[in-house]
């Protein structure tokens, strides 16, 4: 049974106004579409004990309309034969999935780990898929902060998106969280300049910077997003939009906005801020995307 979401007239007006910035996201689907029309996303992560992270990202990608989604786990064998509640998601080991050539976009790092196997998988993806959009989050960012070879490979990606929280940003810059937070705009621009990437600096009023230093300040969201797995969901949302062909900067900005706006919808509909589960975000984002598209 689908949750019942709603928005007040003023909230709806404000969200519709913001959505005008994201024309590729809120475009109605053609009636003759098929699953291949909406791309294939690969989510790579899930070391032992962290199998839930890629599941959150992959399920979010499905909710946001991706045609097909793979989840790859950095383990010798798959942690489960099928994901309970999400049989639509295809499963593979991380090293095997990294070799596929039919992937339209990648999300790498959700619970990946930072050991030798993780570094090798990340390096392989960055080497073999330089022409595809690649979102790096969590442990993938931690590897970049310590491994010079992988850092150089990342710079060679044409459509790279980094999604650090302040601590990950500090590690990438070799500085402190306090210094990042003292000037978030400078931090997000510097990371973008170092990697030639679009950067999503998460936190209150998430910042998105393009490689040419255009800055988007996200105004959506609330404290309910301060929950484990929220960042994995954001990565899955952005990856889903990329796989569907949304331009990189628009996908990053719209993903950040939808992620926050979904939490706002949940708060307005059910009064939930404290105790919001990460897995509850994407269904609200799906509802919002469809509601806005219908209204455009």
Curated annotation (Swiss-Prot):
Self-association state and partner proteins as the record states: Homotetramer.
Primary gene name: nnrD1
EC number(s) on file: 4.2.1.136
Coiled coil: none
Domain (YjeF C-terminal): residue spans on this chain: 18-292
Catalytic activity: (6S)-NADHX + ADP = AMP + phosphate + NADH + H(+); (6S)-NADPHX + ADP = AMP + phosphate + NADPH + H(+)
Enzyme class per UniProt: lyase
GO molecular function, one term: NAD(P)HX epimerase activity
Native source organism of the sequence: Neisseria meningitidis serogroup B (strain ATCC BAA-335 / MC58)
Keywords: ATP-binding, Lyase, NAD, NADP, Nucleotide-binding
One BP term from GO: metabolite repair
Lineage top rank: taxon: Bacteria
Family: Belongs to the NnrD/CARKD family.
Known cofactor(s): Mg(2+)
Electron transport as UniProt keyword: no
Function: Catalyzes the dehydration of the S-form of NAD(P)HX at the expense of ADP, which is converted to AMP. Together with NAD(P)HX epimerase, which catalyzes the epimerization of the S- and R-forms, the enzyme allows the repair of both epimers of NAD(P)HX, a damaged form of NAD(P)H that is a result of enzymatic or heat-dependent hydration.
Record: residues binding AMP: 202-206, 231
Protein name: ADP-dependent (S)-NAD(P)H-hydrate dehydratase
Binding-site residues, (6S)-NADPHX: 53, 113, 165, 232
């Amino acid at each position: 049974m689908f949750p019942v979401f709603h928005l007040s007239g003023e909230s709806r007006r404000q969200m519709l106004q913001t959505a005008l910035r994201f024309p590729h996201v809120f475009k109605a689907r053609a009636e003759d579409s098929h699953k291949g029309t909406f791309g294939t996303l690969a989510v790579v992560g899930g070391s032992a004990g962290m199998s839930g992270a890629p599941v959150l990202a992959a399920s979010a990608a499905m909710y946001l309309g991706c045609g097909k989604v793979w989840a790859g786990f950095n383990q010798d064998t798959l942690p489960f034969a099928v994901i309970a509640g999400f049989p639509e998601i295809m499963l593979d080991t991380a090293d095997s999935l990294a070799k596929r050539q039919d992937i339209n976009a990648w999300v790498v790092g959700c619970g990946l780990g930072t050991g030798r196997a993780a570094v090798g998988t990340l390096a392989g993806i960055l080497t073999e898929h330089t022409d595809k959009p690649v979102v790096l989050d969590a442990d993938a960012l931690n590897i970049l902060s310590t491994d010079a070879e992988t850092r150089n490979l990342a710079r060679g990606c044409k459509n790279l998106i980094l999604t650090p929280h302040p601590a990950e940003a500090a590690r990438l810059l070799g500085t402190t969280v306090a210094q990042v937070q003292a000037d978030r705009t400078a931090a997000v621009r510097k990371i973008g300049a170092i990697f030639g990437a679009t950067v999503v600096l998460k936190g209150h009023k998430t910042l998105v910077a393009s490689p040419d230093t255009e800055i988007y300040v996200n105004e959506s969201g609330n404290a309910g997003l301060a929950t484990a797995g929220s960042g994995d969901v954001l990565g899955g949302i952005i990856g889903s939009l990329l796989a569907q062909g949304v331009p990189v900067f628009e996908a990053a900005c719209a993903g950040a906005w939808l992620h926050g706006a979904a939490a706002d919808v949940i708060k307005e509909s059910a009064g939930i801020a404290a105790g919001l589960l990460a897995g509850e975000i994407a269904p609200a984002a799906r509802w919002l995307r469809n509601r806005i598209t219908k209204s455009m």
